[in-house]
C-alpha cells in the first residue's frame, strides 16, 4: 500500500500521473498519526511505500520517516518501507545522505529502501548515477521503472503513447469480488504476494484511492472501519479509465463496470 505524504514535486516530468506541481500541498503530522493508527489497526503495515509528489520535498520528511519507523518498531514484526524518490535530495549534501543511511540501518525489524527513479527517457533533469551512494545498502537505482505509460495526469494531457492492459485499480477491485470473505488485510497481503504493492493508496488528507494517482476518485477514508472499506471497494464505480478497461475481455471487464 502507498502513503502520499505530499503532492509537491518540482521536477515537472511529462509522464506524471499525479500532475504533481511545485505548489502541491503536504500531509500534516496530525493526519500522519491517524494514518498510522489506521494502518496498524487494519494490519496492512508489512510493506509500505512512502511516495508523493516527491516525498523528500516534504519539509518534515525525516521526522515523518522516523515517526513511521517508530510506530512500526513497536510491533516487533518484519516490515518493509520503500521510499520512491528522484534522488536529488539525497545527492544535495552529505547530511541528507547520512540521514538516509541512519534510516536504512535503524532497526533490525524494519527494512528501509530508497527506490531511486533515474529513467532518462522521461526525467527532465539527469541524475548522476555514478555516485558511490547508489551502490550502498538500501539504495536501489531504477533506470527502467517506467515499464509502460499510464494515461492519467500529465501523461494524458501530453498525449503520451500508452500500453496499459487494465486500469490501476483493476487488481484490488477484482480481488475484492473473488476472495471469500475478504478483509482489507487479506486484499493487501494477497496483492503483495503477487508483487503488487501500490494499492490501495492513502492521500494527504486521509482519503483512500484504489489506483496509483491522487487524481483517482476517493473510494473510502482512513476514518472508515476496515469492513466498511472492503464493502466500498466491492461497490466502487469509476469510469475514469474506460479507454483502457473497455479493451478487456468480458470475463475481466465484469469486475470494473
Model features per residue range: what roles?
Residues 1-83, 90-95:
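Conserved alpha-helical substructure of the radical SAM core
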Residues 10, 55, 88-89, 119-121, ...:
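Short, solvent-exposed loop/turn segments at secondary-structure junctions
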Residues 34, 98-99, 228:
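Exposed alpha-helical structural elements
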Residues 34, 132, 240-243:
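Charged/polar, solvent-exposed surface patches and flexible loops
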Residues 40-43, 107-108, 194-195, 235:
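Flexible, charged surface loops at secondary-structure boundaries
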Residues 58-192, 196:
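Conserved AdoMet/S-adenosylmethionine-binding subsite of the radical SAM
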Residues 162-257:
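Accessory C-terminal segments flanking Radical SAM cores
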Amino acid at each position: 500500500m502507498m502513503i502520499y505524504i505530499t503532492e509537491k514535486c518540482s521536477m515537472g516530468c511529462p509522464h506524471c500521473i499525479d500532475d504533481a506541481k511545485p505548489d502541491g500541498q503536504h500531509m500534516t503530522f496530525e493526519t500522519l498519526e491517524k494514518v498510522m493508527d489506521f494502518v496498524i489497526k487494519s494490519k496492512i503495515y508489512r510493506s509500505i511505500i512512502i511516495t508523493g509528489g516527491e516525498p523528500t520535498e516534504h519539509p518534515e520528511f525525516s521526522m515523518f520517516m522516523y515517526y513511521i519507523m517508530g510506530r512500526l518498531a513497536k510491533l516487533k514484526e518484519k516490515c518493509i518501507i520503500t521510499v520512491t524518490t528522484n534522488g536529488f535530495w539525497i545527492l544535495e549534501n552529505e547530511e541528507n545522505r547520512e540521514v538516509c543511511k541512519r534510516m536504512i540501518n535503524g532497526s533490525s525489524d524494519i527494512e528501509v529502501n530508497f527506490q531511486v527513479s533515474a529513467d532518462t527517457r522521461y526525467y527532465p533533469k539527469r541524475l548522476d548515477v555514478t555516485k558511490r551512494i547508489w551502490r550502498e545498502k538500501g539504495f536501489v537505482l531504477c533506470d527502467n521503472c517506467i515499464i509502460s505509460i499510464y494515461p492519467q495526469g500529465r501523461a494524458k494531457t501530453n498525449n503520451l503513447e500508452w500500453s496499459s492492459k487494465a486500469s490501476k485499480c483493476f487488481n484490488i477491485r477484482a480481488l475484492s469480488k473473488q476472495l471469500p470473505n475478504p478483509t482489507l488485510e487479506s486484499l493487501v497481503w494477497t496483492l503483495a504476494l503477487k508483487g503488487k504493492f501500490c494499492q490501495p493508496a492513502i492521500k494527504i488528507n486521509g482519503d483512500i484511492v484504489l489506483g496509483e494517482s491522487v487524481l483517482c476518485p476517493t473510494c473510502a477514508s482512513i476514518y472508515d472501519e476496515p469492513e466498511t472499506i472492503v464493502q466500498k471497494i466491492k461497490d466502487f464505480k469509476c469510469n475514469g479509465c474506460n479507454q483502457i478497461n473497455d479493451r478487456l475481455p468480458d470475463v475481466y471487464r465484469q469486475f470494473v463496470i
